[in-house]
């Protein structure tokens, strides 16, 4: 059930809905921590499956577009987002990366509570507060100057010795007491209550009537200098904030300057322990390299500064009852266990299911049906079952066994829950499989995979239509798609003639997809898009691949025994060969126009990984340029990686590359390499 494509589409819908609630309506349904886990999981999936990345994905934005109800302010220097750490290990990795980039010199670290409010930029000209804007998308924000003028802790006039023009950045917030008072007043008036202080602060600042904002007990802490025309300011973030404190700006008194990472970790531990007693909401700690000149040396990567990181507080955990362990069927026949839970609210989201991965994972955690379990949403969109609460366990409960759970009394054996097919677990693998190649659940997932963006990219056929086409019997194997007619589609419920025509056109357009897309779309077990590209370049056409033997496959770099055996097994099945023949008869391109790699080409012997969003071309285009120059384009960072090309919103691959010492290339450096080649 939990295919990457389905999960990515569900995630984007969920994140976009929450963005609308959060940024536009100021009435979100989930906490910032829960939102972070959604974004983190989506980034992980897009890193693992780059063919699923789209320009409109929420991961491709810093924030949200400004509201048109307010004027637009262009930020002279972008308000960047921060990379996140969720453990001491990740924080230490950031510190070591920075040290290495700076040549192992010592540096001081600023430690600041990560306020859970609304980021704003305040510009002063000739001693007067001139403009105030929200973060917006990082490059443009909403002009909320009139509303910010009502906040008493924002000076309307700067001290005479202040720089002639400068911008400071701060977090507008509502204290816990102020939030409680505001909600009591709203309850008395019969108005809807705010979900949390952050929403209340954001909603207050986005009032079209400044008098409404003036009634709210808003406050601000300044956390950074955006820019200044005074070149005599100190080369220390700490001293700059101290300077602005002395000329009338409010700085958080809990900020600390430390000399070592151990001191920084201790600061975090103290803040986490005292989190509940803080007068405002905070969701972590921000660490910054103190020296401004060192900050400039370190620069940014994507849309995140290298010199700062946000160490988030732990995710919320709750207890609920695990009613049942269900089993879903994947496209290759994998039998995937998942927890069916008593509905429980975790960080503002009602959770009914959680991932369990496989039988070994369930037994390792000793999770049983009927248990009271601890659930958390940290790094997993599908929430995770952390552990059972043994003190609440029914003494008669039994350990979970996949084959016992799948036992079908009518067949007197374990069976696939969808088709009743026999199941097996290959030696050395963690997953059980349904052996029935005609299992309808498998084919539904296979069809979803074939039409997906990374494969044949047939627009208009998504998850739901794939299921309908399979269940209605219109498509019994993937080649049937190319024999559909508009009349066939018009038989389906809620299908109009224009939509049907568009789908038929999209199917026809897909016939010219490159060979590697076809190979990937066929869904051969263990053959991902990287392997499909290797096979396409090596064999040049599908029939040469179909006729190959195990020995030849094993001579191809990165094709191991498991992949080779899977390929041979796939093409030894006559039904698979018959599908490919029908694809060929329908006009699907089954040959490659790629040229063999010349060892004297500029990128020969180099292995590249591309991460994040590039401005000049898509990730797929960048990978094709690498291949055209003889290089290898991979999806995952390993010790063999020569270069990591880093775009905006880079994810976990960047952290992994830094931990392994892989050389990073900015987009401009990558383009320079292309031009010089």
Swiss-Prot record:
UniProt function note: DNA ligase that catalyzes the formation of phosphodiester linkages between 5'-phosphoryl and 3'-hydroxyl groups in double-stranded DNA using NAD as a coenzyme and as the energy source for the reaction. It is essential for DNA replication and repair of damaged DNA.
Record keywords, A-Z: DNA damage, DNA repair, DNA replication, Ligase, Magnesium, Manganese, Metal-binding, NAD, Zinc
Binding-site positions, NAD(+): 32-36, 81-82, 112, 135, 171, 288, 312
PANTHER family to which the protein is assigned, alphabetical: CHROMOSOME TRANSMISSION FIDELITY FACTOR 18 (PTHR23389), DNA LIGASE (PTHR23389:SF9)
CDD domains noted in UniProt: BRCT_DNA_ligase_like, LIGANc
SMART domains: BRCT, HhH1, LIGANc
Alphabetical list of InterPro entries matching this protein: BRCT_dom, BRCT_dom_sf, DisA/LigA_HHH, DNA_ligase, DNA_ligase_AS, DNA_ligase_CS, DNAligase_adenylation, DNAligase_N
Family matches, as SUPFAM superfamilies: BRCT domain, DNA ligase/mRNA capping enzyme, catalytic domain, Nucleic acid-binding proteins, RuvA domain 2-like
Residues the entry annotates as binding Zn(2+): 416, 419, 434, 439
Molecular functions (GO terms): DNA binding; DNA ligase (NAD+) activity; metal ion binding
Catalytic residues as annotated in Swiss-Prot or TrEMBL: 114 (n6-amp-lysine intermediate)
Cofactor(s) annotated in UniProt: Mg(2+); Mn(2+)
GO biological process: DNA repair; DNA replication
Pfam families for the chain: BRCT, DNA_ligase_aden, DNA_ligase_OB, DNA_ligase_ZBD, HHH_2, HHH_5, Nlig-Ia
Domain BRCT: 598-677
Enzyme Commission code(s) on record: 6.5.1.2
Family listed: Belongs to the NAD-dependent DNA ligase family. LigA subfamily.
HAMAP family named in the record: DNA_ligase_A
GO CC annotation terms, alphabetical: cytosol
Protein's name in the database: DNA ligase
Catalytic reactions of this protein: NAD(+) + (deoxyribonucleotide)n-3'-hydroxyl + 5'-phospho-(deoxyribonucleotide)m = (deoxyribonucleotide)n+m + AMP + beta-nicotinamide D-nucleotide
Annotated gene: ligA
Native source organism of the sequence: Dehalococcoides mccartyi (strain CBDB1)
């Amino acid at each position: 059930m939990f295919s990457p494509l389905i999960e990515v589409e569900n995630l984007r819908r969920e994140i976009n809905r929450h963005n609308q609630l959060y940024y536009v309506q100021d009435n979100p349904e989930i906490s910032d921590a829960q939102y972070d886990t959604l974004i983190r999981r989506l980034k992980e999936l897009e890193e693992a499956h780059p063919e699923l990345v789209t320009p409109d994905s929420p991961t491709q934005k810093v924030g949200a577009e400004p509201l048109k109800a307010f004027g637009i302010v262009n930020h002279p220097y972008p308000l960047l987002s921060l990379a996140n750490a969720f453990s001491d290990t990740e924080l230490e990795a950031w510190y070591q990366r920075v040290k290495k980039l700076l040549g192992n010199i010592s540096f001081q670290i600023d430690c600041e509570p990560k306020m859970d409010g609304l980021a704003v930029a305040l510009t002063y000209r000739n001693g007067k507060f001139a403009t105030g804007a929200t973060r917006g998308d990082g490059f443009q924000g909403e002009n909320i100057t009139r509303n910010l003028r009502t906040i008493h802790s924002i000076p309307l006039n700067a001290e005479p010795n202040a720089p002639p023009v400068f911008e400071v950045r701060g977090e507008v917030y509502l204290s816990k007491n102020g939030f409680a008072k505001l909600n009591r007043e709203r309850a008395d008036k019969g108005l809807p209550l705010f979900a949390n202080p952050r929403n209340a602060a954001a909603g207050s600042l986005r009032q079209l009537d400044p008098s409404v904002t003036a009634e709210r007990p808003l406050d601000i802490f300044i956390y950074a200098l955006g820019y200044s025309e005074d070149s005599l300011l100190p080369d220390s973030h700490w001293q700059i904030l101290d300077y602005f404190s002395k000329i009338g700006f409010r700085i958080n008194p809990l900020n600390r300057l430390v000399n070592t990472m151990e001191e920084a970790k201790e600061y975090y531990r103290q803040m986490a322990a005292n989190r509940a007693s803080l007068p405002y909401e905070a969701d972590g700690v921000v660490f910054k390299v103190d020296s401004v000149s060192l900050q400039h040396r370190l620069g940014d990567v994507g849309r995140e500064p290298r010199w700062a990181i946000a160490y988030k507080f732990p995710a919320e955990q709750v207890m609920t009852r695990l009613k049942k362990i269900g089993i879903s069927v994947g496209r290759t026949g994998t039998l995937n266990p998942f927890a069916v839970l008593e509905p429980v609210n975790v960080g503002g989201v009602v959770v009914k299911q959680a991932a369990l991965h496989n039988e070994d994972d369930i037994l390792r955690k000793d999770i049983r049906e009927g248990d009271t379990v601890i659930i958390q949403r940290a790094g997993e969109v599908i929430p995770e079952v952390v552990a059972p609460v043994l003190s609440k366990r029914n003494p008669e409960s039994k350990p979970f066994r996949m084959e016992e759970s799948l036992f079908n009394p009518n067949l007197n054996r374990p069976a696939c829950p969808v088709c009743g097919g026999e199941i097996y677990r290959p030696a050395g693998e963690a997953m059980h499989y349904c052996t029935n190649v005609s299992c309808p659940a498998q084919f539904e997932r296979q069809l979803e995979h074939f039409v997906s963006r990374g494969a044949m990219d047939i627009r208009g056929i998504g998850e739901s239509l794939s299921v309908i086409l399979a269940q209605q019997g219109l498509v019994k194997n993937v080649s049937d798609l190319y024999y559909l007619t508009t009349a066939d589609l018009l038989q389906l419920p809620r299908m109009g003639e224009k939509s049907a025509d568009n789908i038929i056109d999209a199917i026809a357009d897909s016939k010219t997809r490159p060979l590697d897309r076809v190979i990937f779309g066929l869904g051969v077990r263990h053959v991902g898009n990287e392997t499909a590209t290797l096979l396409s370049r090596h064999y040049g056409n599908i029939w040469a691949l179909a006729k190959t033997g195990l020995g030849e496959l094993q001579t191809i770099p990165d094709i191991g025994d498991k992949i080779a055996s899977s390929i041979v097994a796939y093409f030894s099945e006559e039904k698979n060969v018959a599908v490919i023949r029908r694809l060929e008869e329908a006009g699907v391109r089954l040959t490659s126009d790629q040229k063999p790699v010349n060892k004297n080409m500029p990128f020969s012997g180099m292995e590249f990984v591309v991460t994040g969003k590039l401005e000049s071309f898509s990730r797929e285009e960048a990978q094709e340029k690498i291949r055209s120059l003889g290089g290898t384009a991979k999806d995952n960072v390993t010790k063999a990686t020569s270069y990591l090309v880093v775009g905006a919103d880079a994810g976990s691959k960047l952290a992994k590359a830094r931990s392994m010492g892989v050389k990073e290339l900015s987009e401009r450096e990558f383009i320079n390499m292309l031009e010089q080649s």
